[in-house]
Amino acid sequence: MKKRNISIKSKVEIQELFKKGRFIRIEGINIFYEFTSLSISRMIVTFPKVFKGAVKRNRVRRIFKECFRKQLALLKNRYVDFIFVVYPQRVDVNYCEVDTMLKNIIVHVMKRKV
């Protein structure tokens, strides 16, 4: 079985999502999202330049990716690209916190779908 990649890799797609995507700010995390015609929902976790410490950044990335993967069922065949910009004050997030937050964000995004 082929592993599905949920990351946005293209610099052009990321820049376009920053320009055209909708915006939510929640507790030190900025979220940009846009509905897409692709057959998969994708995401990327990024940080401002002032966020030092690769170990902490990578831990936050892993937590976000795993929680996002588990919450994909809530999207119900609607496909959305997300960018999560995490600021340094949110470096000590735990799995349960991120899981609950992502669930609420996805429900909010689905309600805003036209």
Swiss-Prot record:
Pfam families: Ribonuclease_P. Its EC number is 3.1.26.5. It catalyses: Endonucleolytic cleavage of RNA, removing 5'-extranucleotides from tRNA precursor. GO terms for biological process: tRNA 5'-leader removal. GO terms for molecular function: ribonuclease P activity; tRNA binding. Keywords: Endonuclease, Hydrolase, Nuclease, RNA-binding, tRNA processing. Signal peptide: none annotated. The keyword tRNA processing applies. Gene3D superfamilies: 3.30.230.10. It is an enzyme of class 3 (hydrolase). Consists of a catalytic RNA component (M1 or rnpB) and a protein subunit. RNaseP catalyzes the removal of the 5'-leader sequence from pre-tRNA to produce the mature 5'-terminus. It can also cleave other RNA substrates such as 4.5S RNA. The protein component plays an auxiliary but essential role in vivo by binding to the 5'-leader sequence and broadening the substrate specificity of the ribozyme. Belongs to the RnpA family. This is Ribonuclease P protein component.
